[in-house]
Swiss-Prot record:
Region (Disordered): 873-910
Keywords of the record: ATP-binding, Cell inner membrane, Cell membrane, Cytoplasm, Membrane, Nucleotide-binding, Protein transport, Translocase, Translocation, Transport
Residues reported in the UniProt entry to bind ATP: 89, 107-111, 496
Bias (Polar residues) ranges: 876-886
Gene Ontology, cellular component aspect: cell envelope Sec protein transport complex; cytosol; plasma membrane
Protein's organism: Leptospira interrogans serogroup Icterohaemorrhagiae serovar copenhageni (strain Fiocruz L1-130)
Localization in the cell: Cell inner membrane; Cytoplasm
Protein name, per record: Protein translocase subunit SecA
SUBUNIT field: Monomer and homodimer. Part of the essential Sec protein translocation apparatus which comprises SecA, SecYEG and auxiliary proteins SecDF. Other proteins may also be involved.
Membrane topology of this protein: Peripheral membrane protein
GO MF annotation terms: ATP binding; protein-exporting ATPase activity
One BP term from GO: protein transport by the Sec complex
InterPro entries: Helicase_ATP-bd, P-loop_NTPase, SecA, SecA_CS, SecA_DEAD, SecA_motor_DEAD, SecA_preprotein_X-link_dom, SecA_SF2_C
Amino acid sequence: MNMIQNILRVVFGSKFERDLKKLIPIVRQINSLEESIKGMDDSTLSSQTKKFKERIVQGESLDSILPEAFATVREVSLRTMGMRHFDVQMMGGIALHGGNISEMKTGEGKTLTSTLAVYLNSLAGNGVHVVTVNDYLAKRDANWMKPIYDFLGISVGVIQHDMDHEQRKVAYAADITYGTNNEFGFDYLRDNMVSHKDHKVQRSHFFAIVDEVDSILIDEARTPLIISGPSDEATDKYVRVNKIIPKLSEGEDFEVDEKARNVLLTEKGVSHVEEILSIENLYAPENVDLVHHVHQALKAHKIFRVDKDYVVQQGQVVIIDEFTGRPMEGRRYSDGLHQAIEAKENVTIAKESQTLASITFQNYFRMYDKLAGMTGTADTEAEEFKKIYNLDVIVIPPNVSVQRKDSPDRVYRTEKEKFQAILTEIRELQSKKQPVLVGTISIEKSEVLSKMLASAGIQHNVLNAKFHQKEAEIVANAGKPGAVTIATNMAGRGTDIVLGGAQLYKENLETWKDEDEIVKQFKESILRQNLEYAESLMQKMDSGTKQKRASEILSSVKIWKKNHEEVLAAGGLHILGTERHEARRIDNQLRGRSGRQGDPGSSRFYLSLQDDLMRIFGSDRISGLMKWANMPEGQEIESKMVSNAIARAQKRVEGHNFDIRKHLLEYDDVMNRQRIVIYKMRNEVLENEDISPLISGFIEETVENQIVTHCEGNNPSAWNLESLKEWSDGLDLNLQIDEVEFKKSKNPQLSLFEKVSSTAKLKYESKAEKIGKDIWKLLERNIFLDILDHRWKEHLYSMDHLREGIWTVGYSERNPLVEYKLQGFRMFDTAIENLKNEIVNFIFRVEVSENSKLPEEKKEYKKVGQEITGGFQEFSGGNLNRSQSNGSSVTVTTSSGGGTERKTSRRRKR
């Protein structure tokens, strides 16, 4: 394969070269328009939007408008924000418009780049979604780029987690909507639970640009979005099962599989559990739940670790995002795992929940007509992006070549030796005033390192889930001379670390609103770092207040500039990785925090043979290295075998995780096809005021099923007319059937069908006439939606249980996925048939009277109570009560949140 790739590269050039060849001519075309666009006054420039839209209405494509639109955005950005798009940013924008992933290094201006494709696609009038990883970035990016869009007459909306229905509707009605992946996904699910089409908030899924696309479409791909309702199960069973875990022995009663993040009971363990719980057969049908709880309790004790996977704060178990180190407050593991951890930590145990609606990010984002993404690290996952999302990765060259020096890894035998070497390097770096960002993979490790630094008298900041409130401040100061910052993984991602520390004077400039021409010139000279001219302008200001403010800004700039030059002289920001992550991409993200926009920088990883990656995924040959004799303590291991083993281990884990994500998608595709059918049916009801043709079709199908069941064939003497009559009486059809009458017919069964159908149709029409057409139409729709939601909820519950138990068919050498598809299809077929029967039964049995009033529409949209993301649940907000067809009330619940590669496997139990 490598030889073929090499031949293709020689003949056609590398993919990178081929991509550039396509982009460069378009960039030249854009640049050729720059002078003519510059010559436009503000009024003419802002009217470009109207002209573009008119051309689109006349049939012109977005592709043909692209050069002019991009040149327009570039000029507007320069006039409103003082930022001109570089040519490489133009390339990134073209790639985004083409429905690709633009890989742009940290500091290359991805947010500004996105404005090009966002503006162009907003002209189509179908709405553009810009997807970010958290609420803060959604709001920041929208407000930051808003001057460009405002100038061009393009509206901007922002979705935030705490918004109500009306606020969301307004945000989605805008030309451009910023929000998180979770909010977009949950709004889609909620839209498919509303009782009236006007209650929907989202429009079409036309075009989405996903920022940090690797984080959302790869890291969180195993995180199903789930809207759930409370279950009636008691919580005392968790306490009961939790007590038996300390009595079980690892190796004898159970085995821990760290690679798969799983625990398996041995035969001896099964017997031991049966003995402790005083039961005869743990795997008897009545003990299915018990097996599940024992399994989850074992995982809680043996796989999930406090201060690594979660923290306990104020009597609650709070999940830690594996990829960012951030706390995921309000979110919960699903399938009883969170309750098992609560029992382990001896805190209040919350009730389990039942799924009401769900979708994976994979299937949600594949609904968009066009999808694009941005990140600094996508190329290592190019195969997955192509196979799952049909997205090509286009690597955009940096505007200024990267000056960062990446040094080889230093590997030690033990973790203790590694940390000692790290301490020595940090001390050396701080002595020469070089700022250092220390990346760790867990809170536990960050706190161990923090204690060592404190003992050595080294001042430092820690950024992890326990101190996340100070994140912005800590990240802002991480570039100061001699600053030492410990951060778990990619905490602070999305915010650049500026060499010299935070440029506080910029905030002061932005908030200084003054139309005085001298003040304007002063602000411009500060941004251009022309401090001498700025000082002369300060002297010309016409008031002491203005001069005082200008003086404060100048002082702030001078302090930052001195710090900036000191850091540059020291070598820029140094990245010190304390452990390799399972994915090379995460390591690259950490390295990418240094060397932005041509700044100097450096990076090095310190590893030990006791690190999780080496211990769990390294080959047996590596473990032999730990027995090396005659090596003095603290000496680093320099071996190609170690370096190659690290690379192989990472590739092995990446492949393993890709297989899991692909496996999840294969299972979710079964549910997705069913979800599409249900939501299509639901939308048909919402979009049509009169659904009587749909109901009439259900009535005919129900009648046909009854006749096929009770009156098979054309021999009336063999028919079970008594059962048919019993069914018809239940619907109050008043059906009169004479066997003799049908014996005279050429096709007795068809004649019977026609008679029963016409009787049912007359009964149906008389009910509608009696109550009044308008009331009847609304009543029908309400009945249909309530029964549909109820049946769908029950079907999801059944599919959950099918998924949990389907692994057992593997023992009989059958493929669990094939079996899941077959059984899932049969169950769905039955659910649809039951749905139709129940709707028909309810329609005929519903009591109506002449003075019936029109049912009140549910006007209010409330943020629903419980959300689950990626196997996580979230409790927040109020309740949305929906009456069910059986008269009971269900409290619907909803979601938001992110997830991690391993924590999200909510289905994969065994």
